[in-house]
């Protein structure tokens, strides 16, 4: 899916951001702008600015869909910008994974104009400009070098009930501040010896505005700039300036950055007054982050799961990471559909996991080819079927899409059926296979159970039946014998034997990390079960990330990591119904 398309569905849930953009378009807030080359700029430019210090998760997917989706819908553009200002935690591995995730979700930052530069940026590309702008703030008397330790700065900042106290270095002269800042840049000081702070208001009710740090010393190798810099700008300084440099119109953040918006405006307004930027400036808007039940998205918690081998890695199909849900079999379209359904609001709320699973289920129901898989096999022997013989049966690839054609598979004397489809002593209302009862083999014949084989412990190891030759599905005699039960099967000598991983929710508590609980206590011991299954023979040719509905079971995907040619491994993506609903 390209960034020019969106999944078909009912109208999207409410999105207050659209109202803001509509108002800006109506008043011409960002009309008539041009870039440095004189080319006209779109009236809507958004950006997705991840820090490359980990793998993206489902919450990031919402932000990606919001930013890229709005740009798409308003014929604008969205930039992918890496906020790579912390060299200690960042790595090109994460850069590559984020690029792959955005592309996989169906979006692109490439300009629609032929020959134009793709809008992929790094905050580190602006380090020279950021440094220059920091000096501009010093020269205007609104930034100073503070020589207190981080602990001292924190102690002097105050709290919600007490105002902060000014640093003893707050009134250094412009000349001294410039000298110290340049010496910081030149590597004359150790980490933590000095910081550059904005001079705003140590009594501000908003603690963010109590002389926030703009630059800190960090002698560390950067993944792009190497050892050129030993001072690095803070997020709040970098973010707004990067937006202005890139001509962003609507800077969309989650609610935790709401208190940072005054600082965003403060930096840009001071640089505008210094002649660096001009009106209209970018504006920051906040929307509610995605809180999903039965999941955690804390990077620290997810890392703990990986480090303690509670999961197999960042791409474990039970993880909420984009690489995890992709491996689980979720589709990009289902994620976009989910984000459209939950909408964008100003207030935090919890979205039930069933909403996400429902979007995945609806998307796959419309597209996934059908197939048969026996996950808990029990041998069924048709005693009156000729030995060594087989015949073809057929079924639609998709019952609602005849244009997808039909699939053909063999029936023989020995079959595999689901163990739960036989019961020697059935309860009332059980219409599947039991001694003396008739059922239909789906797409095949009506059969009558005649007996069982048992092992020394009395366990049923095989079921015997006779088939009724005139009752094959699709023939004139198909309805000659009425039965209530219908079971699926695969031919034993022809079946594709495969490993199938039955995944479920990683946690059995809807809020595993709430109220001081140890989230590890909420791990679901049934979140992964591995079985050896017997599948319709055609599944032997399944390629990685091919998706199917296993009839009566759910939706499955050929694992993109472990599947081999002729030997696929399947992951359960989601069941046919919500098994967690009350």
Curated annotation (Swiss-Prot):
Gene Ontology biological process terms from the UniProt entry: glutaminyl-tRNA aminoacylation; glutamyl-tRNA aminoacylation
PROSITE patterns xrefs: AA_TRNA_LIGASE_I
UniProt: ATP binding residues: 51-53, 57-63, 254, 289-290
Motif ('KMSKS' region): 296-300
Broad class of the protein's primary localization: cytoplasm
Lineage start: Bacteria, Pseudomonadati, Pseudomonadota, Betaproteobacteria, Burkholderiales
Pfam families: tRNA-synt_1c (PF00749), tRNA-synt_1c_C (PF03950), tRNA-synt_1c_C2 (PF20974)
Cystine connections: none
Assembly description: Monomer.
Protein name: Glutamine--tRNA ligase
